[in-house]
Amino acid sequence: MNLSPREKDKLLISMAAMVARRRLERGVKLNYPEAIALISDFVVEGARDGRAVSELMEAGAHVITRDQVMDGIAEMIHDVQVEATFPDGTKLVTVHEPIR
């Protein structure tokens, strides 16, 4: 299987998000990379489903809460930017203050 660097990145984010979901199910608080991966995966999959950029920007801020991440992680993440493929092309989606 020949994957482009971008496809490899998307696969890595997806896998990290799967790990994060399993940890949340066990009650384990997420670290920085896991939180970023989970939010990023939500945006990428939402774009794939045809959701609007504005909708993903808003909904992306409700994927995880402060109670689900380790102490200090919410303060470290001010914005999450994800390049996602929508039905009409690739767009940059920014989720502001994603952990509330």
From Swiss-Prot:
Signal peptide per UniProt: none
**Family from the record:** Belongs to the urease gamma subunit family.
Reactions the enzyme catalyzes: urea + 2 H2O + H(+) = hydrogencarbonate + 2 NH4(+)
Subcellular location(s) of the protein: Cytoplasm
Which keywords does this chain's UniProt record carry?
A: Cytoplasm, Hydrolase
Q: Which InterPro entries has this protein been placed in?
A: Urease_gamma (IPR012010), Urease_gamma/gamma-beta_su (IPR002026), Urease_gamma_sf (IPR036463), Urease_subunit (IPR050069)
Give the multimer and partner information.
Heterotrimer of UreA (gamma), UreB (beta) and UreC (alpha) subunits. Three heterotrimers associate to form the active enzyme.
Looking at the keywords, is Hydrolase present?
yes
Q: Which domain of life is it from?
A: Bacteria
Q: Which NCBIfam families match?
A: PRK13241.1, urease_gam
Broadest EC class assigned to this enzyme: hydrolase
EC number(s) for this protein?
3.5.1.5
| Organism this protein belongs to | Allorhizobium ampelinum (strain ATCC BAA-846 / DSM 112012 / S4) (Agrobacterium vitis (strain S4))
Its ancestry begins with: Bacteria, Pseudomonadati, Pseudomonadota, Alphaproteobacteria, Hyphomicrobiales
In Swiss-Prot or TrEMBL terms, this protein is called Urease subunit gamma
Q: Which GO terms describe its cellular component?
A: cytoplasm
Any one GO BP annotation for this protein: urea catabolic process
Q: What is its main location?
A: cytoplasm
Instruction: Provide a Gene Ontology MF annotation, just one.
Output: urease activity
Supply the SUPFAM superfamilies for this chain: Urease, gamma-subunit
Protein's UniProt keywords contain Hydrolase: yes
Biological pathway? Nitrogen metabolism; urea degradation; CO(2) and NH(3) from urea (urease route): step 1/1
Family matches, as Pfam families = Urease_gamma
